[in-house]
Amino acid sequence: MSESVHTNTSLWSKGMKAVIVAQFLSAFGDNALLFATLALLKAQFYPEWSQPILQMVFVGAYILFAPFVGQVADSFAKGRVMMFANGLKLLGAASICFGINPFLGYTLVGVGAAAYSPAKYGILGELTTGSKLVKANGLMEASTIAAILLGSVAGGVLADWHVLVALAACALAYGGAVVANIYIPKLAAARPGQSWNLINMTRSFLNACTSLWCNGETRFSLVGTSLFWGAGVTLRFLLVLWVPVALGITDNATPTYLNAMVAIGIVVGAGAAAKLVTLETVSRCMPAGILIGVVVLIFSLQHELLPAYALLMLIGVLGGFFVVPLNALLQERGKKSVGAGNAIAVQNLGENSAMLLMLGIYSLAVMVGIPVVPIGIGFGALFALAITALWIWQRRH
């Protein structure tokens, strides 16, 4: 089946619906599994600084497999790549259920996620293009954030009831994603027949990195999305320690409710970006990025639940408005230069390197005993300064 058959079809075509459902279930499993596994670490008396280490082994898999997953996504039908990747996630979640070391099981989920990401975003450029691509990204982000909203809450609430039930629910979600992937049309491979020599693949990936980094637009997108997702993941772990200190609440569910507020906000922000920002007006998203850091700083000083909910929702709105146009810009420019799969793989390397760095710094700060509120204040201020610097650089170039 040729790729052109599906390009420029309705945003609600059968293929797009299958992609969105598969993404929802896969992301639901990812987010529920994080909080279920954090509850498992707490129940097994792991130290607090080990919590971000869990996410670090996950993103480490992204970085390790970054040179290869883009070519995998471009060499096979992307729907089948997504199905295989969700199968790996299912295996990882099931292994934690059956008592395998949670860090090992979560690493396997990370390998599946690394393979999944270039395919899930790359397939959008095959199902639609041009002006519809920003809207397709909005649908993908809305689906993802809805899954974050429900998955995070489900993981925390079920873990308060029984950790094993929470872990089993994650495995079921991944199983559902595998089934949904079956209904994605089998599009032609974007770049079949490439060499599978690991040295050549690594060299090709480094060439893709160089190509995207040397282009001003794609470099701008790579830096912006890397900063955003690195900060977003760090904020999730910050909330786990901030809630008992600032609010005096010690259950597993409250941090997930707060994360849900961010998720709701991102859905709103992603929708606004799809309507108000085009590939030609991407710079409109930059003030929102700066305000994210400012609002995080203000949030860190709160001691009441209602203001915390409101500020986190605002952070989400700003985040959705900021990141969706940057994603669309990279996909459109990257598809023309290095292929959509390679472009997303390079993006994953940048984003996960930022996550690894920020989580490492955060884990170190917790380990040496810095209080969580000053960590939050410094985190927000540094993020605002970083996005300001990126905007100044973008305007000059």
UniProtKB/Swiss-Prot annotation:
**Which key words are in the record?**
Cell inner membrane, Cell membrane, Lipid transport, Membrane, Transmembrane, Transmembrane helix, Transport
Q: Name one GO cellular component term.
A: plasma membrane
Give the residue spans that cross the bilayer: 18-38, 53-73, 91-111, 145-165, 167-187, 227-247, 257-277, 281-301, 305-325, 344-364, 367-387
Topology in the lipid bilayer: Multi-pass membrane protein
The residue spans the entry assigns to the Cytoplasmic side of the membrane are as follows: 39-52, 112-144, 188-226, 278-280, 326-343, 388-397
* GO terms, molecular function: lysophospholipid:sodium symporter activity
Domain of life where this protein originates: Bacteria
Family indicated by similarity: Belongs to the major facilitator superfamily. LplT (TC 2.A.1.42) family.
Recorded protein name is Lysophospholipid transporter LplT
Q: Organism source for this protein?
A: Shigella dysenteriae serotype 1 (strain Sd197)
Q: What is the lineage of its organism?
A: Bacteria, Pseudomonadati, Pseudomonadota, Gammaproteobacteria, Enterobacterales
Gene name tied to this protein: lplT
